[in-house]
């Protein structure tokens, strides 16, 4: 590793010999030097993904739950919508993990995991995420806004924001609730935090399933 760098330095300063053999090898030395410099200063971050989690209680699907449900793309603020994972998020500060990144943009990943969680909790219903390829029109929508999605300074994992559900064409009779969920991580590493965030996302699915069963009946169509 040091010899190409020495040739690279000598070539730039003009101290390298200009005999034919050295002249031919000079471009090779330059290329090797650049590769060596690039290889010493870069490393790819580890990639992490949220994962669906099973329901913690037996599921009884209310007859009022609409047959087809769409999980809208979650709202994620720019402070969280970044490639590198936010490791700590407190009231006045936020820090990212330089060696850890999400495997895909956070908003669509969260939407797909939430739709999978909700499908597990609503057997017999069809649940899909916004922008999924489907020709079935949704009869109800689940919307999530995220404001907090990381550890705090003490190590407790938070998922905060809001959850709302409503029938298609009837948003004024929808139901909404604030989200302020916490879970202890099983360790201090990034994997433990992502696992805790996955558990909290499953709790959001639990809440959405209950709210969908509490929606008022679909309005009767008007006949003119």
Positions of the model-derived regions?
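N-terminal secretory signal peptides that target proteins for export/translocation
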Residues: 1-21
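C-terminal motif of bacterial Sec signal peptides marking the signal peptidase cleavage site
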Residues: 35-39
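A structural "domain/chain start" motif
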Residues: 40-106, 217-224
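Surface-exposed short loop/turn segments
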Residues: 41-58, 121-169
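Soluble periplasmic/extracytoplasmic beta-strand elements of cell-envelope proteins
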Residues: 68-74, 86, 141-145, 158-164, ...
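Short secondary-structure boundary motifs at beta->alpha junctions and helix caps
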Residues: 93-101, 169-207
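Sec-exported extracytoplasmic/periplasmic mature domains
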Residues: 115-123, 209-217
């Amino acid at each position: 590793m040091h010899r190409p760098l020495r040739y690279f330095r000598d070539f730039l300063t003009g101290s390298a010999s200009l005999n034919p053999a050295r002249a031919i090898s000079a471009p090779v030395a330059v290329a090797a030097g650049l590769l060596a410099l690039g290889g010493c200063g870069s490393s790819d971050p580890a990639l992490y993904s949220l994962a669906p989690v099973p329901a913690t209680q037996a599921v009884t699907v209310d007859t009022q739950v609409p047959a087809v449900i769409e999980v809208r793309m979650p709202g994620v603020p720019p402070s969280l919508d970044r490639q590198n994972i936010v490791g700590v998020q407190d009231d006045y500060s936020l820090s990212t993990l330089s060696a850890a990144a999400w495997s895909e943009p956070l908003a669509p990943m969260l939407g797909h995991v939430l739709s999978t969680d909700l499908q597990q909790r609503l057997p017999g219903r069809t649940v899909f995420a916004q922008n999924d390829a489907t020709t079935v029109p949704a009869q109800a929508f689940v919307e999530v806004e995220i404001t907090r999605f990381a550890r705090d300074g003490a190590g407790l994992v938070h998922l905060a924001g809001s959850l709302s559900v409503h029938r298609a064409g009837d948003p004024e009779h929808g139901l909404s609730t604030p989200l302020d969920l916490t879970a202890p991580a099983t360790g201090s590493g990034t994997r433990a935090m992502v696992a805790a965030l996955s558990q909290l996302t499953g709790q959001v699915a639990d809440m959405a399933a209950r709210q969908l069963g509490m929606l008022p009946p679909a309005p009767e169509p008007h006949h003119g």
